[in-house]
Amino acid sequence: MKGADLDLLGANFREISNAQKEQLDIRHGLEVIKVNNGAMKNAGITKGFIIQTVNNQAVRTIEELQKAVKEASVSKEPVLYIQGIYPTGKKAYFAVSLEN
């Protein structure tokens, strides 16, 4: 179950470190550590981007991201609205379609 939900996104993630939290003045997030072909790449999300919220829900762990993907994929509108920040401090927003 764990891999299957996130395979759709085509990216790998890790929880951010305390140093990243301090540097960017944020409390939580998941860093995109690799982007392959898939929904994330199609939306323009790149390696290094830190996901903070998905569909207005805070994302602190890979499990929370997984839950958001699962809920969105079975909804009427299978889209992830992602808010986050780049290591430069620039904020960004993406809409990631989960439809094939």
Indicate where each model-derived feature is located.
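C-terminal recognition in membrane/secretory proteostasis and scaffolding
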Residues: M1-N100
